[in-house]
């Protein structure tokens, strides 16, 4: 004989028609968050206990250079006598705007070359070379700016090439220096350095331009890139 209660399926195991209560998991949320924070702290300690720390500093310096250069470069170019506004067909043309656009366009090629370069040479070597180029270009800019239009346009194109070409190189460096189990976290910290702390570059550039000249600004940027190159040298020895 079949049990009637089992046959009609109307009663739950507690002897009533009510469904079994589902446990309240609201208390699990704080526990889960706390566990996640502990895991993140542990992973961060493991990450910064490696050569990634040195790479992190190098990326931070690159971020300062990147933002310090590109934030105010349009204004610096607009004030350059070699790129003074001209009248064309009754319209005022700003050559500085076209030069800056060309700089950004050349940066596309720089990113491609930078990425390809890491397939041919060690990423640290490429990183060092690009930092050195950025330093030389920044220190040379005030002098080249006074020479004439063609040299000024040329150095702007070189700046665009190298400043954007550095991006894929540092990404490869980060991937090589971070342990496999914290690769994702390493990119989070890297972009914090690049676009978070590195954003101080815009503030530094603004302060320098307010209290000094554009020549001083490019000297500061040259020093920043030089420090980046020294950091990569330390990374190669790590």
Give short role names for the model-derived ranges.
Residues 2-55, 83:
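Juxtamembrane intracellular "pre-TM" segments in multi-pass secondary transporters
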Residues 46-115:
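Extracytoplasmic gate region of multi-pass secondary transporters
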Residues 71, 75, 168-177:
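Intracellular helix-loop hinge segments at the cytoplasmic ends of transmembrane helices
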Residues 95-107, 134, 159, 194, ...:
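Transmembrane alpha-helical segments of major facilitator superfamily
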Residues 110-123, 209:
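Helix-to-loop junctions at the C-terminal end of transmembrane segments
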Residues 120-173:
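C-terminal transmembrane helical hairpin of 12-TM major facilitator-type secondary transporters
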Residues 175-214, 221:
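A late C-terminal transmembrane helix in Major Facilitator Superfamily
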Residues 217-238:
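Multi-pass alpha-helical transporter architecture, strongest
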């Amino acid at each position: 004989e079949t049990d009637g209660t089992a046959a009609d399926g109307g009663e739950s195991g507690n002897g009533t028609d009510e469904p079994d209560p589902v446990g309240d998991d609201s208390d699990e949320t704080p526990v889960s968050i706390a566990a996640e924070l502990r895991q993140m702290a542990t992973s961060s300690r493991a990450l910064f206990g490696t050569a990634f720390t040195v790479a992190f500093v190098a990326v931070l310096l690159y971020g300062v250079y990147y933002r310090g250069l590109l934030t105010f470069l349009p204004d610096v170019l607009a004030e350059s006598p070699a790129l003074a506004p001209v009248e064309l067909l009754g319209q005022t043309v700003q050559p500085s705007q076209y030069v800056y656009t060309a700089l950004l366009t050349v940066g596309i090629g720089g990113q491609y070359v930078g990425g390809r370069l890491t397939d041919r040479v060690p990423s640290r070597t490429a990183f060092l070379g690009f930092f050195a180029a950025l330093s030389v270009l920044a220190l040379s800019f005030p002098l080249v700016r006074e020479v004439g239009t063609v040299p000024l346009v040329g150095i702007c194109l070189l700046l665009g090439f190298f400043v954007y070409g550095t991006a894929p190189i540092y990404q490869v460096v980060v991937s090589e220096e971070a342990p496999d189990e914290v690769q994702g976290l390493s990119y989070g910290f890297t972009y914090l350095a690049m676009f978070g702390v590195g954003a101080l570059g815009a503030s530094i550039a603004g302060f320098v331009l307010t209290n000094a000249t554009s020549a001083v600004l490019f000297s500061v940027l040259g020093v920043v890139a030089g420090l980046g190159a020294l950091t990569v040298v330390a990374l190669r020895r790590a």
